[in-house]
Amino acid sequence: QNRPFSGEGIISGWGACRAALPAALQALRRGDVSRAALWGYNTAYFRGQGAKFAAAMAQLPAATEFNAKDTNYLFRHRIIFNGRDFAEMAQTYEVAMGPGKLLKMITFLLWGVLSGQFQASTLKILLRVSGQAGKLKKHYLHFPADPAAFPQWQAEAARLWGEAG
């Protein structure tokens, strides 16, 4: 449950504990600590923090594919790696992408490609991993409330992770 973007795990571990608390209390009160009785924790975790972490994990390997010129362009124009994004990621485990921010990002990326300051191949990587991250997050947001549905969910998750690389 460590944060995919920093490796830190104390705060996110406490977040997981908060997700576990309702299911654990209910199970203890009922005297039933079976897998089924505690399943609510899995549902709460994977539909919340887990979905955000899955999206982040899908995007991380792409950063190793960027060359120095493209990475510097992203930093210089504060497209991806800026202080506000890092602060938001630390607090909410994701970066909100409103229409204004998205338009600015697209404009700078396209300008970078057209002006030769940013590679089209890197833009393709960004688009690919963003799409995969979105698919994974959506899948995790639909984590099954019923343990019997887990094998089917898990098979689809494995397929999506396979596509993500």
Question: Language-model segments: which ranges?
Answer:
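Glycine-rich phosphate/pyrophosphate-binding beta-alpha loops
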Residues: 1-11
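C-terminal catalytic subdomain
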Residues: 13-15, 21, 87
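Short, low-complexity, polar/charged sequence segments that are solvent-exposed and flexible
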Residues: 11-14, 60
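C-terminal auxiliary extensions adjacent to catalytic cores
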Residues: 64-165
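Active-site-proximal substrate-binding core of FAD-dependent oxidoreductases
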Residues: 6, 19-74
